[in-house]
Regions:
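Catalytic nucleotidyl-transfer cores of nucleotide-processing enzymes
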Residues: 120
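Hydrophobic cores of alpha-helical transmembrane segments in multi-pass integral membrane proteins
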Residues: 1-13, 22-52, 61-115, 125-182
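Conserved non-cysteine loop/helix-boundary elements of the Radical SAM core domain that shape
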Residues: 19
Length: 182
């Protein structure tokens, strides 16, 4: 959510460049912190699953969601450290990771398949699609800032980062496509 402040600040020319740099540092720090706990939670969840069901990883939709969160954060941090993305790119990808997290935490529960199919909350799908629409609008605003800026969104071509992001979305859509809802 901190990335939203950066994107709106950049889009509407609010705040100074130093303010936006501090926001980007916060996004970086929160992502590092979140990645640490996502990795620990994913590994400990796998250990617990192995003790409970006799398997570490079964490609359950919830497990895939945990993997997508970790991969998304790793991609963003590596792209930033490698110089592939600048401040705007990092914040736009942070919003994309938020969408992945919403999908992984709430949308996957509605698939009615796998070990984690327990969240059949009525009316939640409408709210999920509203969140997706809002976040797509924020990403679009961020990308429009790229088009209007002279410095640009990406420092150098980031084919590797885009490949890995495409992999995350492939895992997400394959998870949805190969799970049946009755």
């Amino acid at each position: 959510m901190i990335a939203h402040i950066f994107i709106f600040s950049k889009a509407f020319k609010l705040g100074s460049e130093d303010f936006r740099k501090s926001i980007t540092r916060m996004v970086y720090g929160v992502t590092c912190f979140g990645l640490l706990f996502a990795l620990v939670g994913t590994v400990l969840g796998g250990v617990w699953a192995n003790d409970s069901w006799g398997r570490f990883w079964g490609w359950d939709p919830k497990e895939n969601g945990a993997l997508m969160i970790c991969l998304g954060a790793l991609i963003m941090l590596h792209a930033r450290m490698g110089g592939y993305i600048k401040d705007l790119g990092m914040n736009v990808i942070a919003v994309l990771i938020l969408v992945i997290t919403v999908f992984s935490w709430w949308h996957v529960n509605q698939l009615e398949t796998g070990l984690h199919s327990y969240g059949f909350t009525s009316g939640i799908m409408r709210w999920l699609y509203i969140v997706y629409a809002i976040e797509c609008a924020v990403i679009t605003i961020g990308l429009s800032c790229y088009r209007s800026s002279k410095k640009g969104f990406f420092h150098v071509p980031a084919a590797v980062s885009f490949f890995l992001l495409a992999f995350i979305f492939t895992v997400a859509f394959v998870t949805m496509a190969f799970t049946t809802t009755s």
